Amino acid sequence: MPLVYLRMIIAAALILIVNQAGAACVWKVTSGTNVLYLGGSIHALKSQDYPLPAAYNRAFDASDRLVCEVDPKALLESSKGILKAGQYPKGDSLKNHVDPRTYDYLRRVFRLLKVPEGEFARYRPWFLSLMLQAPELHGMSETLGVEEFLIRRARANSKPVSGLESAREHADVFLDLTDRQSEAMLLMMFLPAERERSSSGDEMARAWRRGDADTDTRIMMDEFRNFPSLGERFLTDRNRKWIPKIEGYLQSGKTYFVVAGAAHMGGPNGIVALLRGRGHHIEQL
């Protein structure tokens, strides 16, 4: 191969790398003259993660409406429903729904945390898992998450905000878990790989910052590798359910900015790939 062509190929590759390095987890979707924007979110961030990549503000400014995973007005209702459903009815206990070895292990863990058995045993395993994953326990804040930032901007600019899921649909993601799935969700917190990878939140934030939704999806799916049905439930199934709604937004005549967790955007079963597979043109910003 002549040296000049080799140099041209290397130069083109470098340009591609530089362009990719400057990308954000924001995509422009077009279908004919219709336009929609997708934004990958990290639900909880740190103050040093600001300012957000400029593409988020550009997509917001170009849009008429903002769509999050759940309508913010319904989120409080959903949270109340999840809190209520996360507790067993009076007379029932966690002990009756998990393997005895799991219960004994949890009893030791919560004893170290100085939590009485009567307190933690009131809750279903999936709810205990949510409690242990609370961002505030890991130095992050949901009030600094991407959605919260954009919701505040939407309110300040009188832009309508809606959700891909209703309060009930969002709550049902957890409420319809079987005892086995619920126990698996909690056990994930105590697997050696999970304990060793305590910085996964930071790793996901770094991938999101450089526009690498595929890595965010991989991290999430790796967490579910021992319990693949949970990965299907929390990511893949919801992605597929959202596609008809997103296509409806795209054909509505209005410009929507649809924001969901970055892990929903990447991978072969992510929103970006699913829309591209249906013939829509997608450009990462």
Positions of PLM-derived features:
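Bacterial N-terminal signal peptides that target proteins for export
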Residues: 1-10
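Structured, acidic catalytic/metal-binding patches in enzyme active sites
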Residues: 22-234
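N-terminal signal peptide c-region/cleavage motif recognized by signal peptidases
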Residues: 18-20
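A cross-kingdom marker for long, charged
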Residues: 229-285
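Short hydrophobic "helix-edge" motifs at membrane interfaces and signal-peptide entry regions
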Residues: 8, 30-32, 251-252
